[in-house]
Regions:
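Mid-domain, small-residue-enriched loop/turn segments at the edges of structured enzyme/sensor domains
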Residues: 1-76, 81
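Domain-terminus/edge residues, biased toward the C-terminal soluble/receptor-binding domains
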Residues: 41-42, 53-175
Length: 175
């Protein structure tokens, strides 16, 4: 959920390398809402780039499935989403060194999507997407799986671990 990437996208979209981080979030959020509308996600409105709770920030499972499908249609994003881990500076090349509105650092990152990692909840057909948690939304996951050339998206809200992994597996098996 790297806000530094949202800032880089906003700066590129507006062709404004001097944009403040606060303005970046407004621009990126506007872009999110426009893209959601283009995808037919009519029961969603985004109020921030990070996903934390706001009364004006909401979605539904159908809309997240539409967004997840579009995400996975982007081959670069799909490759990133199925990675179990990453080490390096995730913002390298995205922001200029003199841009003091964005702080970067090296990361050792591991996926929180237990469907793609090598543990107890691994699902061999899982190919990504994104986990989340807030007190209001509980444990969530938008997950993708592919088997026999068919790709499915499962969206789980208001769950608790380990149920979100088991529910996603069950939805994939049902589908």
């Amino acid at each position: 959920s790297a806000n530094v990437v949202a800032a880089a996208v906003a700066k590129k979209a507006e062709n404004d390398e001097n944009m403040t981080f606060g303005k970046c979030e407004v621009v990126f959020t506007d872009l999110m809402n426009k893209k959601a509308e283009e995808l037919g996600a009519t029961n969603s409105h985004f109020a921030n780039a990070h996903g934390y709770h706001s009364d004006d920030h909401y979605t539904c499972a159908h809309d997240l499935a539409l967004i997840g499908r579009a995400f996975m249609e982007n081959k670069t994003l799909a490759e990133i989403a199925k990675e179990k881990s990453y080490s390096g500076n995730g913002a390298e090349g995205l922001v200029k060194a003199e841009d003091t509105s964005v702080k970067t650092q090296d990361y050792n990152w591991r996926s929180h999507n237990l469907l793609i990692t090598d543990g107890e909840y691994n699902y061999p057909y899982a190919i990504g997407i994104k986990t989340g948690f807030t007190d209001e939304a509980g444990d969530c996951v938008t997950a993708a799986a592919e088997k026999d050339g068919e790709e499915l998206i499962a969206v789980i809200f208001k769950s608790e671990d380990p149920n979100r992994w088991l529910d996603a597996k069950n939805l994939f098996e049902y589908g």
